[in-house]
UniProtKB/Swiss-Prot annotation:
NCBIfam families from the UniProt entry: rplB_bact
Record-linked Pfam families: Ribosomal_L2, Ribosomal_L2_C
Region feature Disordered, mapped onto this chain: 306-362
Biased composition (Basic and acidic residues): 351-362
Family according to the record: Belongs to the universal ribosomal protein uL2 family.
Name the record gives this protein: Large ribosomal subunit protein uL2m
Highest classification ranks of the organism: Eukaryota, Fungi, Dikarya, Ascomycota, Taphrinomycotina
Gene designation per UniProt: rml2
Span of the signal peptide: none
Record-level GO cellular component terms: mitochondrial large ribosomal subunit
């Protein structure tokens, strides 16, 4: 088995030789070396071992611990959040202003504060990661960052990507691509445009956690926190372990393949963050007991066949039978193919390929 140092010495030249960018570097094709004071890659970020598949189990001294499973996240901050970036969460128990339940299975739970996460990343410059924190309002983790060499030392929360740790640096390059009032990009600095054209810009700055306009991201790059429009916040791929991939460019659009298999067009002046959202093994957790669901504010889900006829169409009757009727919701909406969400074809003009359904393969 190769040692870490031998593996490191073998992998670095291979990484430098790969053509991972949308535009191949003219220096690399001619055999010349790129003269730069910095390494073209953040080697520490590339060679750092990814989050290992480790699930923490507990000694079954109680029924609630027997089936409890959690992803190992020893790098998380153990203290309280940065209070100026939080607001109080006023829970309503799933009820509207009239007091009626509009969303079932909600209520109770531990007291929480909402973390104000920056999904726009408009502040340029290098930011240092102070710590990685747990956020009760989302499945992924968040990172508290602070801008370097700033008089105000503004702090903000961003969505942490997989592999991001305390002391790392991230940067947003959204301000490089200026857009006019009509959303079209304006002329760019000639020096910067030349670096983008020959691939040296991507070689120096492309690393997980950095935010770029889609136009500056090479084909094949894994991204998350994707903005649909240039002037809006990130809306796609924000949950734990989610990501997308740029597969092509078509005019002013970038074609992105989502995890569901759907391929859609997004304006290349929109932005995205490099990498995968953190806490990638969140889907393998097991709460272990009903009480932990109640701590999360989730109330029990009662089967319709266990209710009375006045409460559900499946209720009443002898035994567990629902009668000679199709499965349906409490409001009579058919559960198996009776409710359509699309009223016609080609509703989304930016959809290139729909996600696989049924037995279709991705």
């Amino acid at each position: 088995m190769l040692s870490y140092n031998r593996f490191r010495g073998y992998l670095i030249p291979q990484i430098h030789a790969l053509k991972l960018f949308r535009y191949a570097s003219t220096a690399s094709t001619s055999g010349e070396k790129i003269e730069s004071s910095e390494r073209p890659y953040d080697v520490g970020m590339l060679l750092r071992p990814k989050t290992k598949f480790e699930i923490k189990t507990y000694k079954p001294i109680s029924p609630g611990l027997r089936h409890l499973k959690r992803p190992v996240s020893d790098y998380l901050w153990k203290g309280k959040p940065f209070r100026p970036l939080t607001v109080a969460k006023r829970k309503k128990g799933g009820r509207n202003e009239t007091g009626r339940i509009t969303v079932r299975h909600q209520g109770g739970g531990h007291k929480q504060r909402i973390r104000l996460v920056d999904f726009e990343r408009k502040v340029p410059g290098v930011h240092r990661v102070i710590r990685i924190e747990y956020d009760p309002g989302r499945s992924g983790h968040i990172a508290l960052v602070e801008k370097l060499n700033s008089e105000t030392a503004n702090k903000s929360y961003i969505l942490a990507c997989d592999g991001l740790r305390e002391g790392d640096t991230v940067e947003s390059f959204r301000s490089l691509l200026k857009t006019g009032s009509n959303g079209e990009p304006v002329e760019m600095d000639p020096v910067l445009a030349a670096e983008i054209e020959d691939g040296t810009f991507a070689a120096k700055n492309l690393k997980p956690g950095n935010c770029f306009p889609l136009r500056l991201i090479p084909i094949g790059t894994v991204i998350h926190a994707i903005g649909v429009n240039p002037n809006q916040k990130a809306k796609l791929c924000r949950s734990a372990g989610s990501s997308a991939r740029i597969i092509a460019f078509d005019g002013k659009y970038a074609i992105v393949r989502l995890q569901s298999g759907e391929e859609r067009k997004i304006l290349d002046t929109s932005f995205a963050t490099i990498g995968v959202v953190s806490n990638i093994y969140w889907q393998h957790r097991q709460l272990g007991k009903a009480g932990r669901s109640r701590w999360l504010g989730i109330r029990p889900t009662v089967r319709g066949t266990a209710m009375n006829p006045c409460d559900h169409p499946h209720g009443g009757g002898g035994g567990k039978s629902i009668g000679n009727k199709p499965s349906q919701s409490p409001w009579g909406v058919l559960a198996k193919g009776g409710y359509k969400t699309r009223r016609g074809k080609n509703v989304n003009k930016l959809l290139v390929r729909d996600r696989p359904r049924g037995k279709e393969k991705r």
